[in-house]
Amino acid sequence: MSLKLGVIGTGAIGRDHIRRCSQTLLNSQVVAVTDINLEQAAKVVADLKLDAEVYPDGHALINSPQVEAVLVTSWGPSHEEFVLAAIAAGKPVFCEKPLAVTAEGCRRIVDAEVAYGKRLVQVGFMRPYDEGYRALKAVIDSGQIGEPLMLHCAHRNPTVGENYKTDMAITDTLIHELDVLRWLLNDDYVSVQVVFPRKSSKALAHLRDPQIVLLETAKGTRIDVEVFVNCQYGYDIQCEVVGETGIAKLPEPSQVQLRSGAKLSNAILMDWKDRFIGAYDVELQAFIDSVRAGQVGGPSAWDGFAAAVAADACIEAQGSEQIVKMSLPDRPRFYG
């Protein structure tokens, strides 16, 4: 039997997930949608030829007996409300990042899930489902390069819109590294410093770009992440792990190598959706499969909380350009 899904939010990522769950993935059926713009929700249903009902709001959708699991892809500040409602209804919920817009909101979700007594929440961090990151983690975990000592990373976008602000380099961009690097290293952060190199002439007046984020983990690993969102040349994700006895590097996406016009070249992707489309498919299929098996897995509410705590420290460090300490409370045994 297909898992009956309700989707809250039919913007770009919501529409893409609805398409994915109704046309690409196995054992799922989108039976309910809603959005703050109900006309947009109805248009998505019509465009994708869904046999789905448009609900007046997220709470009506969550509490519908037709809905077995919920996808939250709405405006970020609404996420906490709908995730808490799904937990209260006892329904599994996949929530796109951010889990909540504050660390306190994430902690409320953690507390609600622990009180319920069963994992219901998966957070939409997709990089742990990327083949390249999985291969990199396998090398680290094997001990082939010894203990990781340093990581050199970069997150580069060709351009960003006028509404992109300096702190969004953390909350919208670096947040993916904050999650995936914890997962790669099985380690937590203890401090961060943000420094600003010479500003790019391609950056808008209100935006400080690029930025360099310097992280330290509890085990002493040092991480530098270059965030450069106006690099012009493409969407480029880099991660190099320097170990005691070797170096492991995130593989580049598979592209045709071209020999032409006295040049040897490889194309660089321009869009994040193209770079991680496979990871999005694997991520949501894993959610569907785990719900059908009776136990939600993947990035947890605790992972969402940990990322939010780190992001708050990074934003503080942006303002001071000094080293900012951070720490997490003890992880509930509930999360393993």
Curated annotation (Swiss-Prot):
NAD in keyword set: yes
GO aspect biological process, one term: inositol catabolic process
InterPro entries referenced in this protein's UniProt entry, alphabetically: Gfo-Idh-MocA_inositol_DH, Gfo/Idh/MocA-like_OxRdtase_C, Gfo/Idh/MocA-like_OxRdtase_N, MI/DCI_dehydrogenase, NAD(P)-bd_dom_sf
Keywords tagged on the record: NAD, Oxidoreductase
Catalytic activity: myo-inositol + NAD(+) = scyllo-inosose + NADH + H(+)
One Pfam short name: GFO_IDH_MocA
GO molecular function: inositol 2-dehydrogenase (NAD+) activity; nucleotide binding
Entry annotated with the keyword NAD: yes
EC number: 1.1.1.18
Disulfide bonds: none
Family: Belongs to the Gfo/Idh/MocA family.
Function in brief: Involved in the oxidation of myo-inositol (MI) to 2-keto-myo-inositol (2KMI or 2-inosose).
Subunit annotation: Homotetramer.
Entry protein name: Inositol 2-dehydrogenase
Naturally occurring in which organism (per UniProt): Pseudomonas fluorescens (strain SBW25)
